[in-house]
Amino acid sequence: MTQSTSVSKGGRVSRKAKKNPDGTMSIVDHLRELRTRLLRALAAIAVTTIIGFIWYEHGIPAWAIGPLHVPRLPSLGEILKEPYCSLPPSARATFSADNECRLLATSPFEMFMLRMKMGGLAGLVMACPIWLIEIWRFITPGLLKNERRWTLSVGTIAGFLFVLGVVAAYLVLPMGLDVLLHLGDSTQISALTGEKYFNFVIALILVFGLSFEVPLFTAMLNLAGVVHYEQLKDKRRIMIVVIFIFAAIATPGQDPISMLVLALTLVVLMELALQFTRIHDRRAARHVSEWEGLSDDEASPLKVAPSSIPAAESIYDGDHKGIAGGGDAHPAGGSGPIPKPSPVTAPTRAPSASESPTPTPSPAPSDSPTSGSHHAPPAAVLRRGPRSWNDSTGDNDGKPGQDTIQSSSFDDVL
């Protein structure tokens, strides 16, 4: 991203950052964009905080537009003290002349600080669409399409679970206070200060809200392949015990009502997460290859049994004559069965031009009882031994006039 300078008609210099075609940015450009996003988010939070500061003392009256009737919205102060004021008068101290339920302040700045805390918290909640959009626009360019989809889905589910936890904490708060403030009411009477009461409520809300995110975290670990359903199934009882211990320690009031509500809700959510991991593992098992579950030092299974090979079809036609049989090498039309090859004959040596024909000698008289004529050997005879070709008509094994071919496997082939 580069920066360009332009001069307006009024003489004012404006600097606009040009975006690179490939979407890359330098570190300075990233810091500049981060500063812009933070300033926008802080400006929105500041405006909504002012609205929350005013809303702390003044509720929004009821109004109606045609058939639509909107009831009165109580002030933030009334919403904050509602769980405490729902207790019976015998469980809380009342120091006002009109016997109105109010929180106790023991320092000059306690009222102002409580109002600022409630206004800031309300402003943060009311401005959440703006600062969430700014965060999303800052991180979106660095994410792929599937990463954007997963981030948006996980963020939406996480926000819903946190809000569900906040609502559950607010509903459990009166019952928890009722149990805690009646444990020693015969000896003491409660007079809660605004600061301690606010800290107690915020702690309970955060515990419930963050605890409701544990099932989502478990499902994400399963999607990442860290944990599986079989592992969680074997440790289900241990998980339930751990959840009850966590609920007993994490709830700020240490009352059994808050502990039981938090523990039972977490058990139900964890069971839903377990069923999600079971379905996901079952679907993933259908697409897992045989070697994906093996470690690095294990060999993958091989299929040693060869598959059956079909018999080859004959390329010859029984009715077609080969070359040796007088058929054509290429049938008419350029297609058809390939002719059979002609049989291989024994090689013969043709006489060269320099060689002159040798007269055939007359056969020598023989004393053998067999009568008959004896033909002269050819000029070249194929022999087996030191000499491959014998051009002479000399003796063979001391018997002149007889040159024979020794029998061998090679002769049989020929």
Swiss-Prot record:
Residues 345-357 have a biased composition (Low complexity). GO terms for molecular function: proton motive force dependent protein transmembrane transporter activity. It is a multi-pass membrane protein. The gene is tatC. InterPro entries: Sec-indep_translocase_CS, TatC. Disulfide bonds: none annotated. Belongs to the TatC family. It is found in: Cell membrane. Residues 403-414 have a biased composition (Polar residues). Pfam families: TatC. The keyword Transmembrane applies. Residues 1-21, 315-414 are annotated as: Disordered. PANTHER family: SEC-INDEPENDENT PROTEIN TRANSLOCASE PROTEIN TATC, SEC-INDEPENDENT PROTEIN TRANSLOCASE PROTEIN TATC, CHLOROPLASTIC-RELATED. The chain crosses the membrane at residues 45-65, 119-139, 157-177, 200-220, 238-258, 259-279. The lineage of its organism: Bacteria, Bacillati, Actinomycetota, Actinomycetes, Mycobacteriales. One of its GO terms (cellular component) is TAT protein transport complex. HAMAP family: TatC (MF_00902). One of its GO terms (biological process) is intracellular protein transmembrane transport. Keywords: Cell membrane, Membrane, Protein transport, Translocation, Transmembrane, Transmembrane helix, Transport. Residues 323-336 have a biased composition (Gly residues). The keyword Ion transport does not apply. Its main location: membrane. The Tat system comprises two distinct complexes: a TatABC complex, containing multiple copies of TatA, TatB and TatC subunits, and a separate TatA complex, containing only TatA subunits. Substrates initially bind to the TatABC complex, which probably triggers association of the separate TatA complex to form the active translocon. Part of the twin-arginine translocation (Tat) system that transports large folded proteins containing a characteristic twin-arginine motif in their signal peptide across membranes. Together with TatB, TatC is part of a receptor directly interacting with Tat signal peptides. This is Sec-independent protein translocase protein TatC. It comes from Corynebacterium kroppenstedtii (strain DSM 44385 / JCM 11950 / CIP 105744 / CCUG 35717).
